[in-house]
Amino acid sequence: NSIFSINKIELLEEKNINTKIKSSLKIYKKNDNTKKFYDLSISSKRSKNILSKDSNGDPKIFLLNVSIEIDVIENNTSKSKKSFNKSANYKNRSNKFELKKYENRTASNLVDKIIEEIIVHLQSL
């Protein structure tokens, strides 16, 4: 049994990240056997920056960052606001299709780690 239940999830910004979050948190929806019922407002962002370039000025190393802000609402009152950030460095690839696949896989792994932290945070409230 869970110690909390999620009534509603409002998702803002990055669609792919939000879909993954919503899917992972759905096991906590509408559990009547708990005393804590939360509404969540979740905003997520994904960014990619160049960390270094080669001698030709082409990107050599990238930084991928995923940030998620969560507002936990209980009885129409904000109970907790928290930001979660994860990032990863990776080398450029000549095959842009492979680069995109790697970026998406890396972002997905970062989101998984943040989801674990979100669940721990909700359990601690």
Model-derived features: where do they sit?
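Amphipathic, coiled-coil-like alpha-helical scaffolding segments used for oligomerization/assembly
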Residues: 118-125
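A structural "domain/chain start" motif
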Residues: 1-37, 47, 125
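Surface-exposed short loop/turn segments
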Residues: 23-28, 32-108, 112, 116
